[in-house]
Amino acid sequence: MSLLRRWFDPIRSSWFYQKPVRQEVLPTDQGLTIYLRLDDVYSYLAAQQLPQLEEILTDEMKPLKVVISNQTASPPNEMSALEWQQYCLNDAKILSKQHRFSFHETPEQPNAEALQQAETILRHTPLRGQDFLYLMEDVFHMLWQKQYGKLRTLHAMASRHHQVQNFPERVFNQTPVLSAYFEFADRKYQAVDDLLRLARRLEQQKLLTDNPIFLINHIEWREHLISDAEELNEIQALDPELDLYIALEDPISWLLLAYIKEELADYYNIQLNIYPLSYHGRDQFDWSLATRLSKRSEVKFTPFCRPTAAASLAMAELFYSVPAEQQLEAMYEILRQVWTKGKDPSFKTHFDQLRRDLNIEQLTEQDISLRLQQNDMYCEMKSQPSLPVLELRIAEQSYVFNSLYRVWMIESIFSNVLEELYKSENESENEQRKT
């Protein structure tokens, strides 16, 4: 690692962390825009929130501008179009259950004819403002709830009785849209994952007239979903196990591991297994995003010295040089030193200090590069669009998800497991009474 990076990164990161996370006021002259695709399942979820959002926007922010694209962007993480499509359907199904969105039990992508009919309806309608948003929500329901008969009827009426409308707040184009997102003051907010962040921003700038209540079962950082002692004992007795696939140069890996270890692992009796990955170039990250996540999750995150490929390899060497039962604590300490002390493991002095701190007498003789490649292969088999990748095993079931945005799923899954367990016990008792 260059001397400039080794010395300048900790200074720069400390300065950046001490700055206010939010710019006090963002310009409102461009209003608020949402980008959708009719064949995007996240757009379907987002459409169910838009009438309420429009209702509580101040007059300054109305009307909400809607851009409907018929062009998708390339899937992330080298996923195929089919893999991405299946991931989105599964993920949206989980989100819909967690946040009480309307959703079909067996969702399918709408067919081309239905999509064209839906676009025609929305292009032709003279409705505007909240009325248009309610219509758009209904059209999305017809597409994704397989209500093709209703869609054909509405399409026939729109085609016969109305002409194409041209309103400035309603745009149809071919802007590549991977999944639904809002745009405010040139900043992008993912339509589901960042909805609460957007609402906080709008509320901060007094651009809402009422309290925003969108994701009703959202789990805040460090607020446990399960607090009843009996329920907690039930989960702990199931011995949950969690695998983490992490890129060592990615600060999100530190934030996620630290949060889970400090807040969830002991509380729920989770066995954590760490699988470091080879260098993925994730040291070029969004500093403001990582800073914001650090403050939201209450995990320390400065000063740091971004690891290079050589530093990541050195971190993995230290990790695999400790006994298996000590590896979790070792990885926590390695990442803590890198992301809160500014240590550079590719620098011999720092490497030797880390080695002493971890009480490593003999470095491993394993081929570290080969070991990381094996972890890469197992991680790729999970077919996830982002890192870190998590696999939770409990009650003979396995659940795979990804990123810091989905950490809430751990507790949500526990809650669902308990619900199924109690349901099964009640059914068993009822059967015994009958006999």
PLM features per residue range, with description:
Residues 81-84, 88, 160, 249, ...:
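Residue-level preference for long, well-ordered alpha-helices that form the structural scaffold
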Residues 35-40, 245-250:
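Aromatic-flanked redox-active Cys/Sec active sites in thiol-based oxidoreductases
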Residues 22, 26-30, 68, 72, ...:
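Alpha-helical context
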Residues 21-23, 61-66, 169-171, 231-233, ...:
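Short hydrophobic/aromatic-rich motifs at helix boundaries and adjacent loops
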